[in-house]
Curated annotation (Swiss-Prot):
It is found in: Cytoplasm. This is Argininosuccinate lyase. InterPro entries: Arg_succ_lyase_C, Argininosuccinate_lyase, Fumarase/histidase_N, Fumarate_lyase_CS, Fumarate_lyase_fam, Fumarate_lyase_N, L-Aspartase-like. GO terms for cellular component: cytosol. It comes from Bacillus thuringiensis subsp. konkukian (strain 97-27). One of its GO terms (molecular function) is argininosuccinate lyase activity.
């Protein structure tokens, strides 16, 4: 077939060269954005008198037809037409005649593809924000059901201090809230229009870029045409934000995997989110959590891939930029899928409150309580720390826990110990007393939950 740009050329490319250079296999995902962008563009052309109203109306009718066909998956794309832009233009000309060739007046594929991706990411970022809020809603529900579920808090994967399971869950709520905030802030840079920047230098036609931007729902336009067509920082920012979100999901999945093991038994995954072994009939594997953990590396790879593509490109457009889309599409699909799976997995998991409770009665996670007890009686904390360290050593040598140590032994360590000491050794009491702002104390968790409910309600519609 003849190329829409073929006037300069006397030889046709080999079929395998065309296939190597074509992007239609993946950029057809931009079909809706491409057509909507074209409708806005031709509407502007008519307003400015660059095409007649009759020509614009005929072009818009053709584009609307193609849009409906696209929604029903009836469009047939060709490698020969290279990309989504030329495929749509070719179909339009076939549908309405040569007047369709006026659509591209005052426009380049360079600003056209950038516009498509801005429109695409604007929509997808909003979807991801909503899906993240839905996951946060699940976390709020689990936290509400586990305010007084006591578990070990860990540092270095060693039991450190008793905490509420709700407090642990809400830690991820706030991480996800920052992820949502980052996505929301990125919309300021996504929601601007490159349309009308042309190939790199603008156009001689009297276009109205602000009007096109308004028609497409953008908040403004790029101030520099070179910048508009050559940078992909808005995609990189999306990939970076998605990498951080996936990092948070991966960390949580790592804990879910540990907690579901026989060594912990803190939770049990629903059968819907686990698989078995082909050889070991007893196995129940947390495959979905493992896949989310693994797919995090995939999203990281997409970020570093595009960073590497961009690092050496001179202004303005270079064909290297064709490599900006597949990682973006893949990240959107991966993040949306992981958020959906994560929400279902957390909503259906069973919490073993008894096992969690046992874990904080058979350890030394209450040691800090004794140090605080002595400090509250006026002993410098460092001295209190030393005394409690010796008590823990004594217990490990005897094979007992701090609750088992007789008061007489405590008094040998310090005369400040009294019978009320044993009251502070209760894990429940230890959690309840940690009532500083943002702490694991039950009053603080209630306050955090109220604030969290308000935040998820902003998008999901709880209130």
């Amino acid at each position: 077939m003849s190329k829409l740009w073929g006037g300069r050329f006397t030889e046709e490319a080999e079929a395998w060269v065309e296939e190597f250079g074509a992007s239609i296999s993946f950029d057809q995902q931009l079909v809706n954005q491409d057509i909507n962008g074209s409708i806005a563009h031709v509407t502007m052309l008519a307003k400015q008198g660059i095409v007649t109203k009759e020509e614009a109306e005929k072009i818009k009718i053709g584009l609307q037809y193609l849009l409906e066909e696209a929604k029903q998956n009836k469009l047939h794309f060709s490698v020969e037409a290279e990309d989504i832009h030329l495929n749509i233009e070719k179909m339009l000309i076939e549908k309405i005649g040569e007047v369709g060739g006026k659509l591209h007046t005052g426009r380049s594929r360079n600003d056209q593809v950038a516009t498509d991706m801005h429109l695409y990411l604007k929509e997808k970022v909003e979807h991801i924000m909503k899906a993240t809020k839905q996951l946060q809603t699940v976390l709020v529900h689990q936290a509400e059901n586990n305010i007084e579920t006591i578990m070990p808090g860990y540092t270095h994967l060693q039991r450190a201090q008793p905490i509420s399971f709700a407090h642990h869950i809400l830690a991820y709520f706030w991480m996800l809230e920052r992820d949502v905030n980052r996505y929301e802030d990125s919309l300021k840079r996504i929601n601007i229009s490159p349309l009308g920047a042309g190939a790199l230098a603008g156009t001689t036609f009297p276009i109205d870029r602000e009007y096109s931007a308004e028609l497409l729902g953008f908040n403004g336009i790029y101030e520099n045409s070179l910048d508009a067509v050559s940078d992909r920082d808005f995609i990189l920012e999306f990939l970076s934000n998605s990498s951080m979100l996936m990092m948070h999901l991966s960390r949580f999945c790592e804990e879910l995997i540990l907690w579901s093991s026989q060594e912990f038994q803190f939770i049990e995954m629903s059968d819907q989110y686990a698989t078995g072994s082909s050889i070991m009939p007893q196995k129940k594997n947390p495959d979905m959590a493992e896949l989310i953990r693994g797919k995090t590396g995939r999203v990281y790879g997409n970020l570093f891939s595009l960073l590497t593509v961009m690092k050496g490109l001179p202004l303005a457009y270079n064909k290297d930029l064709q490599e900006d889309k597949e990682g973006m599409f893949d990240t959107v699909k991966t993040v949306e899928g992981c958020l959906h799976i994560m929400a279902g997995m957390l909503e259906t998991m069973t919490v073993n409150k008894e096992k969690m409770g046992q874990a904080v009665t058979q350890d030394f996670s209450n040691a800090t309580e004794i140090a605080d007890y002595l400090a509250n009686k006026g002993l410098p904390f460092r001295q209190a720390h030393e005394i409690v360290g010796k008590l823990v050593l004594h217990c490990t040598q005897k094979g007992i826990y701090l609750i088992d140590v007789p008061l007489a032994t405590y008094k040998e360590m310090s005369a400040l110990f009294e019978g009320d000491l044993y009251e502070v050794l209760s894990p429940y009491a230890a959690v309840k007393r940690r009532n500083s702002a943002g702490g694991t104390g039950f009053e603080q968790i209630e306050k955090a939950l109220e604030k969290a409910k308000g935040l998820v309600g902003e998008i999901v519609g709880i209130k």
